[in-house]
Amino acid sequence: MPRATNKPATRRRRKKILNKAKGYWGRRSKVYKVAKHAVEKGLQYAYRDRRQKKRRFRRLWITRINAATRQHDVSYSQFMGQYRKSDLDMNRKVLADLAVHDPDAFEQIVDHVME
């Protein structure tokens, strides 16, 4: 009796990996063994970077708010300390966006918070 290999499932599994490896360079996109390793590593990077993305954006927002508040002779930590005590309720993302795209509105916020 011949050996059963379940060829359709094997082909589907390999084709799925090779499709995910499209756009990779050289053997990474053509050879199953190499492509499988490259795809797994790519998925690991994607998982890690989805989490790092949140940290990086928070750092960017803090940097932008800090730069904008220092133009008004206030440090970031002083501003945020007073901001939490104030009646305003905006997150860092919105504050950073205002600091970059609408400096006049941000100046009013700084004045309101620091009074």
Curated annotation (Swiss-Prot):
The keyword Ribonucleoprotein belongs to this UniProt entry's keyword annotation: yes
InterPro entries: Ribosomal_bL20 (IPR005813), RIBOSOMAL_L20_CS (IPR049946), Ribosomal_protein_bL20_C (IPR035566)
Matches recorded under HAMAP family: Ribosomal_bL20 (MF_00382)
Gene, per the UniProt record: rplT
BP-aspect Gene Ontology terms: ribosomal large subunit assembly; translation
Family the UniProt entry places it in: Belongs to the bacterial ribosomal protein bL20 family.
Gene Ontology CC terms, in alphabetical order: ribonucleoprotein complex; ribosome
PANTHER family: 39S RIBOSOMAL PROTEIN L20
Presence of keyword RNA-binding: yes
Domain of life of the organism encoding this protein: Bacteria
Function per UniProt: Binds directly to 23S ribosomal RNA and is necessary for the in vitro assembly process of the 50S ribosomal subunit. It is not involved in the protein synthesizing functions of that subunit.
Name this polypeptide is given: Large ribosomal subunit protein bL20
Molecular functions (GO terms): rRNA binding; structural constituent of ribosome
Lineage: Bacteria, Pseudomonadati, Rhodothermota, Rhodothermia, Rhodothermales
Keywords: Ribonucleoprotein, Ribosomal protein, RNA-binding, rRNA-binding
Pfam name, any one: Ribosomal_L20
